[in-house]
C-alpha cells in the first residue's frame, strides 16, 4: 500500500514516520511532502532515504491513504482537494466537528469509520481528548457516564517545536539568573504552570477545553456533561489528566479496576 504524509518535517509528521517505521503495515511506497523550503531534503525510512516533495507540486493520487500532519490552515486549503484522489486522515482540528466527517479514536468508535466515504476524510481527535475517551469508553459501556470533570497537565510538545525550544532556553536562563523572555506563551513557561491553552471562548473556557468537551460528546455520547480545565506544564513531552466521573449506575473501585485492566 502507498502512503503519504503532508507536513513530514514537523513534529507530528516526524512522529508519524517513526510510528510507521515500527509498525507492521506493509508499505510499498511512502511519499513525504512539506513546504517548498523543505523540498529536496531527505528523511530516512526503513533504511532508505526519501526525498521531500513540494506540496504545491505533489500529486495526491500517488497514495491510497494520506496523513495530514501540517495543521488546520493546510488542512483547510488542501485536504478537500486531496480527498478527490486519496483517503485523507487529518490530524488537525479543522474537520473534527464537521457532521459529515467521522471523528475517530480506533479503540473507542471504530464502528463510525465507515462514514468516511461521504467525503473521503477521517478526522483525528485532539491529543487530550484521545487519552481520556480511551479510559472512559469501557466505563461508559458498563455504568453509563453522567458527568465528567477533567483537569489536564499538557507538555509543551503540544504547542510545537518553537515552544519546546523556548522551554529549554528559559530553563537555562532561569538557572543562570538571566532575564527571561516569552515569545510562544503568555507567561514564562519554565518552572511555571499556565492555566490556559489557546484563546478564551464562550463561558470562560479556552479553545483547548472547548475541544475536549465537544469532541468527547461527538465520540462518546452527546448527553454526557463535561467540564474541562487545561493547564500547560513545563515538561517537554507527554500529557497527564485527572478525571472525576459520575455514573448513572452504582459502581465500586474493584469493578472499575477490573474493567480498566
Language model features with spans:
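C-terminal active-site/capping subdomain that shapes the small-molecule cofactor and substrate pocket
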Residues: 224-261
